[in-house]
Amino acid sequence: MISKLSSRKEHLGVVAPSAHADKTAAKRHAVRNAPDVSVELPYKAPYDWGAMLSVFRAHQLPHLESVDDRGYERVVRTSQGMGWFRVAEGAKEHSLQLSVWNGGEEDIANISQSARRMFDLDADPDVVREAMNADPYLFSIWKRHPGLRVTRSWSGFETMLTTILGQVVSVSFGRTLADELMKAGGTKARHPKNGELIHLFPNAEQLLTADLSVVRTSESRRTAIRSLAMLVADGTLEWEHPLPPKELRKTLLGVPGIGAWTAEYVAMRGFHDDDAFPATDYALKQELKRHAEVDVNRVRPWRAYAAIALWKSYAEAKGTPYDPVV
């Protein structure tokens, strides 16, 4: 019985907490180089692929996500256990290529849908450009950078928690805190590509019983994390069928430790709200102070793209890399 159970866990990529990695095990769990399935993800040009990669690179989750100069990779659960996918420039014009390892046709539809959201591939740049035309300064930015898109996330739950952990700390330390959270509550698994032991991002139920004292953040943020986990566990919050915008914000703002910036940012990246605008963001406030004539309400319901444009303008003015996250 123990032998069969252990084999089942290994097939799923899950290992017992007491398991130890070695080189032989790593090789045994590594997946072959060729993907099981690849599909093209078309988009309407223009599209700034480099800008999208730079954002994902800066905020990749330790061990679960990786970004190089040509693409983005992520570990995911598939119908065959633990797998991963990669998004890179496609062979066809105006497309990205999605490749999935250790997965089948039944996985590609779900991963494809998520990837399209993450990389904002269904946005119509002509519609966004027309909206930006309502404000002269925003339109001037958009004319210089017509391929900007809103970077979304794989999971709204991840976005909520990493955003809370990232409050008033550097981006790099925010990633460290995310790693600590994953180790505190996430399931141990074999990385399907290299066989290394990793921790998956914990689900809501795992976080409700996890010891969060090992995460070097404030007690108020730990409380916020538990509160959000409860809202997800009881079905109040979900990202496939999100609450209406006003109700979503009301629910988020009802959690102690979540303010206007967090609620708007989570709505934009985690719940795919094209009209979200984190007005209290430092960079956005600086840009609106420099350009007092700007009225982002002119471009509704596309204010998320106004935020992207202003973040880009701020980076240009400061001579810093583009990164729509503070």
For the regions a language model picked out, list residue spans one by one.
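HhH-family (HhH-GPD) DNA N-glycosylase catalytic core used in base-excision repair
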Residues: 1-326
